[in-house]
Amino acid sequence: MRLSQYFLPLLKENPKEAEIISHRLMLRAGMIRQQTSGIYSWLPLGKKVLDKICKIIREEQERAGAIEILMPTIQSADLWRESDRYDDYGLEMLRIKDRQKRDLLYGPTNEEMVTDIFRSYIRSYKDLPLNLYHIQWKFRDEIRPRFGVMRSREFLMKDAYSFDLDYEGSKISYNRMFVAYLRTFSCLGLKAIPMRADTGPIGGKLSHEFIILAETGESAIFCDKHFLELTVPDSSIDFSDKAILANIVKQWTSFYAATEEMHDEEEWAKISDNNRLSARGIEVGHIFHFGTKYSAPMGAKVMGQDGKEHLVSMGSYGIGPSRLVAAVIEASHDENGIIWPKSIAPFDFGIINMKPDDEKCTHACETLYKGLRYAGFDPLLDDRNERPGSKFATMDLIGLPTQIIVGPKSVAQNEVEIKDRKTGIKKSLTVENVLNQFSVI
């Protein structure tokens, strides 16, 4: 894409309404625009990042055996009355009526609807286990939406729901999603720490929040530093091997980790001072087993091998892609702007033409631009008639991983400058060497 032809509405000043760095940078980088309180339009740069995050989430969900569906945003109130949640959910749920005066709602979550889909088609234990997921916009009427897309009223959410014959089967599905989440966050360039979460009235131990460390995080967290040394399974992991999955979950839950709400001072005191880590963190995912909470009132049953009907045991697994965009920025930025991990950067390269009216500079830029596109990359060419300083500031602000700087002096020596956005390290290469180096990545 040529920046002269792209829609990138940058802001020079920090917006006064933005309280945290991710909100400021997303507005300044032209990623989002607030339409009303807690509701945002996603502009081209932000949409590209959001799509890349969703792509990684899909890949890891399907690697773990989840199957994608798409459920509507508008739901019937009757389903929620079946589960007894319609009146209990509170003012966060947006309730509406159609022209026939039927009660509807803008879905804040999808347990009832996915349970209805399941009970409509699945009859036998032979069809289990089953894990259905979707990525859809949701709405919760927050009292005080703030922090941009970190806590908005409308947000994009990936929900997966597992269905098993019994609790033992649910544990296997839970472990599968636990490992899938570790891999998902790793692919996004994040180090996520699973922390025991409150299971509420259902009880049990199958509930974890995944927290990333960030200085501006909303939660205080306490964990053993050994977490920082653990290795996330690579793509060769066999999700059908129950023993391997159980061992990975055991490894990642054997050290102390808790948010402030679940913190246990007695357990914390057992950890040596050298291994204690107190920090701030951001929740980026939550997995939860809720048993028959929905299958019982909604009659989601299957015929077991024993010839009897069994209520299915369910689990829920959530990741918010729109929230993740902000979380990544909170964890990866500097005073000049965003620093995107390569896996979700909106463009792979930023090519800076320091002097567009110089024939040699323009020729070198065109050669790089076309060569990188031919190699399968998505470069952004800044071909605007702007000052070099303005172009450098733009590239730093939007955070592309690699900058290729093309100026008259370097081109005269048949070279261009490569700058790593994260480290700031620069090196000079010929145009041919640049194309040779990156065409094999």
UniProtKB/Swiss-Prot annotation:
This is Proline--tRNA ligase. Catalyzes the attachment of proline to tRNA(Pro) in a two-step reaction: proline is first activated by ATP to form Pro-AMP and then transferred to the acceptor end of tRNA(Pro). Its EC number is 6.1.1.15. InterPro entries: aa-tRNA-synt_IIb (IPR002314), aa-tRNA-synth_II (IPR006195), aa-tRNA-synth_II/BPL/LPL (IPR045864), Anticodon-bd (IPR004154), Anticodon-bd_dom_sf (IPR036621), Pro-tRNA-ligase_IIa (IPR002316), Pro-tRNA-synth_IIa_bac-type (IPR004500), Pro-tRNA_synthetase (IPR050062). Its main location: cytoplasm. It catalyses: tRNA(Pro) + L-proline + ATP = L-prolyl-tRNA(Pro) + AMP + diphosphate. SUPFAM superfamilies: Class II aaRS ABD-related, Class II aaRS and biotin synthetases. GO terms for cellular component: cytosol. Homodimer. PANTHER family: MITOCHONDRIAL RIBOSOME PROTEIN L39/PROLYL-TRNA LIGASE FAMILY MEMBER, PROLINE--TRNA LIGASE. The gene is proS. Keywords: Aminoacyl-tRNA synthetase, ATP-binding, Cytoplasm, Ligase, Nucleotide-binding, Protein biosynthesis. It is found in: Cytoplasm. Gene3D superfamilies: Anticodon-binding domain, Bira Bifunctional Protein, Domain 2. One of its GO terms (biological process) is prolyl-tRNA aminoacylation. Belongs to the class-II aminoacyl-tRNA synthetase family. ProS type 2 subfamily. GO terms for molecular function: ATP binding; proline-tRNA ligase activity.
